[in-house]
Regions:
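C-terminal cap/substrate-recognition subdomain and adjoining C-terminal extension
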Residues: 4, 75-76, 82-130, 144-222
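Helix-loop "lid/cap" segments that line or gate small-molecule binding pockets
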Residues: 44-49, 56-65
């Protein structure tokens, strides 16, 4: 059977929540603290499961980024990834490199905004060796090696208006819980054809882990 590997991002491939890290990077610590203080009551209700996770997340996101051009937002996302390689778990990177040759497909399935998840995948998780993007790249090309299997990103997408600015809303459902399974099935609909290995670390990954043939909870922590 064709093997598919699907990974949660925050807390599974990374050491930390990248939403908080990205807001701090993009807006600075003072503005970040002021914004979260404003929404503290809402976040408490969310933790108590009295307010939907996706609504709280969308309100916080809108507070910081509504009205920003998509071009500016994407530039910040790329810069954030370039400065945040340390957030990735070394064991996760090593595992991805190890299983890539046997994989039919690999995906990061994340509630985080895909605009900042994708640069992490492109910069750090696409080559078969951490050095391939530099000194070994020309050697690989000269030997006509088959390109390494890319990791696709299935994340939460932002809504953009006609002027190319972020509305503060999400264009897709928050990629959390059951939505993770729906997003996987939208790309690979014939479940019986695949052997799925899933990796996650939180309640938001429960359905994805249950969907998989092999499920790994809180991996890569060694």
């Amino acid at each position: 059977m064709k093997k598919i590997f699907v990974f949660d991002f925050d807390g599974t491939l990374t050491h930390a929540d990248t939403l908080l890290a990205f807001i701090r990077f993009a807006c600075g610590p003072v503005r970040m603290c002021m914004g979260f203080a404003l929404y503290a009551p809402l976040l408490v209700l969310m933790k108590l499961k009295l307010y939907p996770n996706y609504k709280a997340k969308q309100k916080v996101f809108a507070h910081f980024f509504r009205g920003m051009t998509l071009a500016r937002f994407d530039a910040l996302c790329t810069a954030f990834a370039q400065h945040s390689e340390h957030l990735l778990r070394p064991a996760a990177r090593s595992f991805i490199n190890t299983v890539r040759p046997e994989a039919y497909a690999m995906a990061i399935v994340s509630a985080s905004i895909d605009n900042w998840v994708r640069p992490f995948a492109e910069l750090y998780l696409q080559s078969s060796n951490p050095q391939d993007n530099s000194q070994n790249k020309s050697q690989s090309n000269s030997q006509n090696h088959k390109p390494s299997l890319p990791i696709i990103v299935l994340g939460t997408k932002v809504e953009v208006d006609a002027a190319g600015c972020l509305t503060g809303r999400f264009a897709t459902p928050n990629c959390y819980g059951p939505e993770k399974v729906r997003r996987i099935e939208a790309v690979w609909p014939h479940r019986e054809q695949y052997d799925v290995s899933a990796f996650g670390d939180s309640r938001g990954d429960k359905e994805m882990l249950a969907y998989a043939d092999q499920a790994y909870f809180k991996p890569f922590r060694f």
